[in-house]
Amino acid sequence: MRAFVLIKCEVDSVLSAVEEMEAIEDVIRVDAVTGKYDAVTEIDASDTDDLRNVVAGEIHSIDGVAETTTCIAT
């Protein structure tokens, strides 16, 4: 299951948050972006439980991550 996570970060924490997300096993790619969100992460999860663990357990535990929106690819 492939998903894209749109991430809002606290001021001055985008680059460090991106570096930490790059180390997450299921993360395929993460990019800092401009606009409404600060980063976009592509995830390859085995199922919805795995996706939930990556987003809620790993990404949300990173200092500076303020909010996420998850989009599941079909």
Each language-model region and where it sits:
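A compositional/biophysical signature of low hydrophobicity enriched in polar/charged and small residues
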Residues: 1-74
